Amino acid sequence: MAGPLVSALIAHLDSSFEGPNGDYPAIMEAIAGLTAQQALWRPSPERNSIWQIVDHLAASKEWQIEMLEKGQAESPPWTEPPGDEESWQALVIHLKDTHKRLKLALEHLKDEELLEYPVPELNRTLLELILSSGSAHEAHHGGQLSYLRGLREGKFQV
């Protein structure tokens, strides 16, 4: 069973991923009901689409899992989406799956491990790394997703 610090961290990650949290849009709330065509939209050619941000979030969760399990991970690449509905739905399922797998990886940690420095040259505890690459990162992108959706639909969601 996870200790209180690990449990609080998982609850925080769940809040930024699934909501509701009242402070900022959760990832799954921001993409609920979107089609592939809607997810592909971008406000200008040089900006990322909702699809690309969702793909980036799934890849970032994979990175976090690798860091927890192996102590190192490659930076996730940005990719161009295939664009079809089946691929979009598969990506949403993959995102949910990586969230579950990240939670499982975290549940195996002891609270004390969160206070260790896994990458000494970064001079940050595992807890700091997870908060910055996990929930803070998701809150940032949750805002982007909600904003992009609002731009596309001609309204803003809060």
Language model segments and positions:
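Short, contiguous alpha-helical
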Residues: G3-V6, I10-I31, A36-E80, V119-V158
